[in-house]
Amino acid sequence: MEFLDLGPFSRASGTIRLPGSKSISNRVLLLAALAEGETTITNLLDSDDTRVMLDALEKLGVRLKRDGDTCVVTGTRGAFTARTADLFLGNAGTAVRPLTAALAVNGGDYRIHGVPRMHERPIGDLVDGLRQLGAKIDYEENEGYPPLRIRPGQINADAPITVRGDVSSQFLTSLLMTLPLVRTGSGVSTVQVDGELISKPYIEITLKLMERFGIKVERHGWHQFVVPAGQRYQSPGSIMVEGDASSASYFLAAGALGGGPLKVEGVGRASIQGDVGFADALIRMGANLQMGDDWIEVRGVGHDSGKLEPIDMDCNLIPDAAMTIAVAALFADGATTLRNIASWRVKETDRLAAMATELRKVGAKVKEGEDFIIIEPPEKLIPNAAIDTYDDHRMAMCFSLVSLGGVPVRINDPKCVGKTFPDYFERFIALAQP
């Protein structure tokens, strides 16, 4: 197995410009493909997950012109021209879920599959919602999981659709993005959310991007979403993808742990991503942090001890960036508790179990619950821990921060960061100093 040895480092400073957001990149690609007109997308993320989406769109007949981080998409006016396709989508949830929904109403014969882990990630609640529209979707192997076979159905949105909100917000995102493509005799298409909706900021991203493409969605609290009929996706002409706020979290934490000043460009107060809320968590932990509209700068910790303060936090709104808090908790002056993170279990790996296992390798005492984790930092970090990454980009990036504790750390399978940030380690090493 490939590995990368990092550190020991004691400082981190400099400036980094973030790659584009994965969540925004794949949403914008699909919306541009479904729109009327040509869309120029800039600062598009180049990663495994976006390549999977681009390849799928090309197979579906979408015309794309790529040049570096710019992509020009010629829209299909709401209907893909390819009526049959076999789509391998890797482990990209941001491609599998929305494409499943869009293809379910497209009137063709499609197969959607991915890596073995993708076939363990639930999709049943989305399929149930799409079947309420008349979609014909079959499971090829296990009920509730990919691979999927999609066939033409009698599609309409006359009756409200109900979808669970407590497993993944991507199910609701996928339905909302698809409803403008579906005819309705009632004048509106309605989605009812059953139970507590998790990861609400990701729904905010979806609604704001749909609006950029000409679709207004009426939100009634977090339990009902109404799409008035007669709307069609229209290209905004051009759209820039803001920096990835989840990826920002590693560098912001590095600025706190390594003294800074470390400036992250590409996200800030004007961001539409919920994970920018990680900055508030860092401030609660004692970091010296300043923020502009599209930048954030961290200058170490405001305590004489140089240690972060432990926190007890509900992480429902920042599930991905919360992983960074878990590793930063190794540098806190007491036990940190992260709550409401059940969604970790259905991500690229079971992140709760993986996080607990790897934190223990560097000396932490960890209590892992169904939807929480408690991290008690060690007196001294254990050097030369070999961190397993579970083919999960965020596990690899999070644990790079251990090297800022003055100990070397080994990251196994470092290339898994290709999912969202292929040159992450080069960028991290450029900012870290012994």
UniProtKB/Swiss-Prot annotation:
What name does the UniProt record give this protein? Answer: 3-phosphoshikimate 1-carboxyvinyltransferase
First-tier enzyme category under EC: transferase
GO biological process, alphabetically ordered: amino acid biosynthetic process; aromatic amino acid family biosynthetic process; chorismate biosynthetic process
Which subcellular locations apply to this protein?
A: Cytoplasm
Gene Ontology terms for molecular function? 3-phosphoshikimate 1-carboxyvinyltransferase activity
UniProt similarity note: Belongs to the EPSP synthase family.
Q: In which pathway does it act?
A: Metabolic intermediate biosynthesis; chorismate biosynthesis; chorismate from D-erythrose 4-phosphate and phosphoenolpyruvate: step 6/7
Which organism does this sequence originate in?
Paraburkholderia xenovorans (strain LB400)
Instruction: Give the binding site residues for phosphoenolpyruvate.
Output: 22, 93, 121, 170, 351, 394, 419
- Active site, UniProt feature: 320
Q: Which gene encodes it?
A: aroA
